[in-house]
């Protein structure tokens, strides 16, 4: 079947329609399909929009319309046209024919937009967040925005691809953070900030047809429990949803990415294992080169060329939808600026900075570093100390085989990676900690 056959005149189409034994036009899907494929008004008019998962009318068909999406009013006009022009009146057959012709005439508006872009060669991704929001123009900010753009492009061309990163813009109210995400979506209908509940059965309807989705309210009220819910939500690659008029639920691969905005600096709950899905960028609107709405047309043109630059990277194939290991390490440290102060980690670090021994255990840290001299640690407190030592403290290496501690018995623990020595040169120490005496050394007795 070919939905884009050359249009014919109405008389030619009528002459080619199947008829009944009595000579009337047959009420068949085939006849309805022939009309939609060849009628001069309807040929090429109906298409399936992959982004919205809906049927669209993509060219004028003789009556005023407010949007491209096929709606009930459009159906009434189409039924009237087919009845008056061809004598076709079976609504179910007409609707089935519309479904077939739309499926054979698919399009994706974001793919079409991105594919038509031509980059002028000027680098903008590196400087965009400084230009509009006053963020630092460093490698981290560049890599953060580039990763987000490539994730959005990948989701458009490869729906459901794995991308669980949220770019989070952090700064005072009125900085233009939400406006940035809205303009980044290119068209306002491709943007949404209406996602309020992640456990809603109809969450797919909130994502449907959108490319850039801002989570502002959820990030503003985030706590440890809700952050875990957001993490789980970001990790999903599809929704399983049954559209009301369909018989069976179907997988709906995600075609969108998520951005976060927060006015509060410490918007991330304390998570010593890392919040790798959240990439925070601090913005300083007073340092911005322009306000993003000062000249909206110019801002949109700038962003359009930034998408063109990102498309060059995407088409080259030389990218990954993840930070490099070095940038991951930087991110983990950087995220601590956006968490509440970790007082227990600070107390343990202060204790270790003054401690002269070469190994410690969790029980020792509980009693001596956290000042619980007369208490016994609970299991969850031991786990917390282990997490701090393994995630937050550097220069100490975990040993899994228990060793003897004079006050705490045999315990697993941590040892200094570079133990302090009495002589300035660690290589001069023997295994037992004594200095080897050579023939040239004079004994002091």
Protein language model regions, located:
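P-loop NTPase catalytic core of nucleic-acid-dependent motor ATPases
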Residues: 98-208
